[in-house]
């Protein structure tokens, strides 16, 4: 029987039915001062509950354990935790689900601020993308900025409307509109819509209540190429490499797309990118696969600087982790991968192959690109070893050669510049 009840409340919510009953017979009620003030009028004097201000999450479990009594079947032993709106929608509910057995928990949702915002604006919830920047890097917004998207955003002090406007301006979406919905359901509720320019021009004069959500209608000038991609195949020139014009240590677009198609990234993958350079493969992997975890390993100081700059530029700060060090020495402390890409080996390809191949599980993938002849020979030798039927770690092997010629129109007509062919090996552990 549940003895921890997580009840969603809003300023305008009516506590009725089972939620009201358990609250009126609870041993303790935990919530913010604002939430406790909302429920106090509903409590019965003959069943006084202990009222506790919600502590930090690191202290909450011990508080609940201290308040609990042995008999969870006694309704008087119930502990109430107050939550904002729907506890299981970007709320405290997930924390409870990971820290307590499900049979101890019961949830009572109220309308969430996201739902309320949609109703105020007459927008269907299924037509918006909900994003929480609360406690997250503002740069993660960049992975969601696409033309004609409507983003409903839960924010904190680092992602206020002015900060959202700056991100729109910096990424070429300066025609976007931002609607700020403050203090929803409170007497001093306020809804205002701003252009990006208005928010930036009047930045110091404009202030917003701490309780607010923002609707971002993403718009940019038509026909203008923007920094952030909307389809796989990020232009080489979009990366920061220190060389300009798409030059420098990045895997070029045509080869990069071949590598991504061979890696077949999916949710919950852990992928190592060894010799990540300026981040061509790692950044594109992370940008299109936000539930994939990528570790980009690089030892060269200047490339690391550009790799970090590209991580910020494309907003892949949550799922792309940069590791400074030499492989294979720096790999020991990383989470075990199920897929590995080697784009650079500093002449150490044989040792790398011998080190990383045993780490992969059955069905794991190793993808390696090769331009230099000695790298191609080492991969050929490795392929011969793992292709033998008697090999303990046999592999299914696929090899493609990507040859690219890029055309450019000059006064003499169309001229092609051939690029060095790249061999891409894929090994799947059988």
Map each language-model feature to its residues:
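Class I S-adenosyl-L-methionine
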Residues: 1-106, 115, 291-294, 298-300, ...
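A contiguous loop/helix-start segment that scaffolds small-molecule binding in enzyme catalytic cores
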Residues: 2-5, 16-18, 59, 150-248
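Class I SAM-dependent methyltransferase SAM-binding "motif I" and its flanking Rossmann-like core
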Residues: 10, 85-148, 328, 394-415
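Core SAM-dependent methyltransferase catalytic element
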Residues: 214-220, 339, 409-430
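Conserved class I S-adenosyl-L-methionine
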Residues: 268-277
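Conserved SAM-binding loop
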Residues: 307-308
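C-terminal substrate-binding/active-site "lid" region of AdoMet-derived donor-dependent transferases
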Residues: 356-421
């Amino acid at each position: 029987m549940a003895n921890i009840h997580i009840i969603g409340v809003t300023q305008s919510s009516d506590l009725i039915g089972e939620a009201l009953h358990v609250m009126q017979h609870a041993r303790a009620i935990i919530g913010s001062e604002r939430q406790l003030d909302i429920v106090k009028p509903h409590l019965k004097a003959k069943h006084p509950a202990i009222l506790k201000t919600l502590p930090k999450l690191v202290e909450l479990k011990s508080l609940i354990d201290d308040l609990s009594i042995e008999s969870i079947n006694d309704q008087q032993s119930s502990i109430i935790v107050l939550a904002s709106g729907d506890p299981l929608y970007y709320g405290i509910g997930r924390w409870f689900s990971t820290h307590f057995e499900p049979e101890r928990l019961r949830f009572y949702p109220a309308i969430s601020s996201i739902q309320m915002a949609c109703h105020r604006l007459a927008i269907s919830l299924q037509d918006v993308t909900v994003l929480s920047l609360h406690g997250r890097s503002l740069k993660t917004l960049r992975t969601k900025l696409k033309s004609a998207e409507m983003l409903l955003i839960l924010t904190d002090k680092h992602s206020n409307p002015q900060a959202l406007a700056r991100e729109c301006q910096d990424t070429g979406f300066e025609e976007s509109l931002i609607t700020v919905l403050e203090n929803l359901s409170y007497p001093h509720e306020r809804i205002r819509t701003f252009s990006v320019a208005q928010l930036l021009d009047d930045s110091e004069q404009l202030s917003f209540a701490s309780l607010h959500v923002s609707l971002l209608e993403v718009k940019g000038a038509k026909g203008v190429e923007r920094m952030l991609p909307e389809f796989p195949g990020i232009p080489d020139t979009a990366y920061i490499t220190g060389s300009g014009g798409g030059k420098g240590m990045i895997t070029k677009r045509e080869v990069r797309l071949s590598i991504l198609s061979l890696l077949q990234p999916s949710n919950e993958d852990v992928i190592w990118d060894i010799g990540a350079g300026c981040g061509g493969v790692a950044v594109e992997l992370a940008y299109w696969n936000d539930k994939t975890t990528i570790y980009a390993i690089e030892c060269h100081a200047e490339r690391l600087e550009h790799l970090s700059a590209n991580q910020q530029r494309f907003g892949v700060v949550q799922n792309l982790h940069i590791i400074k060090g030499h492989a294979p020495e720096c790999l020991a402390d990383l989470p075990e991968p199920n897929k590995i890409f080697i784009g650079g080996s500093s002449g150490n390809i044989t040792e790398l192959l011998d080190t990383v191949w045993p780490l992969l599980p059955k069905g794991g993938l190793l993808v390696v690109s090769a331009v230099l002849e000695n790298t191609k020979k080492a991969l050929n030798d490795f392929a011969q070893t793992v292709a033998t039927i008697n090999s303990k770690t046999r592999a299914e092997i696929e090899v493609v050669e990507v040859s690219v010629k890029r055309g450019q129109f000059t006064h003499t007509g169309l001229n092609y510049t051939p690029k060095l062919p790249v061999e891409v090996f894929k090994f799947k552990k059988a």
